[in-house]
Amino acid sequence: MFKFIVVGFFMLLNLQASSSDALKAFKNKDYAKAFKLYEKSAKSGDTKAQSALSYLYSNGLGTKKDSTKAMYWLKKAAEGSNPAAQYDLGMMYLSGYNVEKDSKKAFELLTESSNANNANAQFNLALMYYNGDATDINATKTAELLESAAIQGHKVAQENIGRIYMQLIKFDEASKWLEKNAANGDESAYYLLAEVYCELEKFDKAKVWAQKSIDSGNEDAAALYKKHKLDKY
């Protein structure tokens, strides 16, 4: 079973990437000044400022909380091809947060953000392909997107990419990622590595990982150890 999660919204990332003067005011909690500066840049077409302004409206910082204006500026930023805004808006449509749930719109926005190499969009788009949400189920596309996100350091993508490669019977690729997971302390990877190395007929390695899994209390690993007679290796 894949350990997918829906991660949160990232309007704050655009806020932090915008005008240095506006960011300085925000960090100093001078929200009124930050709002004024972001608003000026947003009206000039700065998509990062538009997304930041959406965040301020959404949270009532430096201005009265206004969900309608927050959505207006987020959509403007997304229409301006801002990857983080496309991701935020896509996730809102995917979850039905403050908007009517619309998986088709979510898929389109996450695809645009993913094409701009947004790791969070790639991860959640992979989930949509995996579940067939607003698209056909496509394990190969799931793997491609997960690997793209994993290479960028997306932790949950890294935890899942090995599993999807196992489903695709690409055991060499699976072992590469599962080894990384195991090195990072993911005990569930121990048993999966034992399975993978049995499939690859690398029984000496399978024995090592099966034993680690047994030591961590996995009864399935003990059965695997016995089934493949790993004590011989």
Which residues does each PLM region occupy?
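Short helix-capping/linker turns of helical repeat alpha-solenoids
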Residues: 43-46, 59-61, 66, 79-82, ...
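Alpha-helical segment of the N-proximal tetratricopeptide repeat
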Residues: 18-44, 59
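Terminal, low-structured helical/coil segments at or just beyond the last alpha-helical repeat
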Residues: 199-233
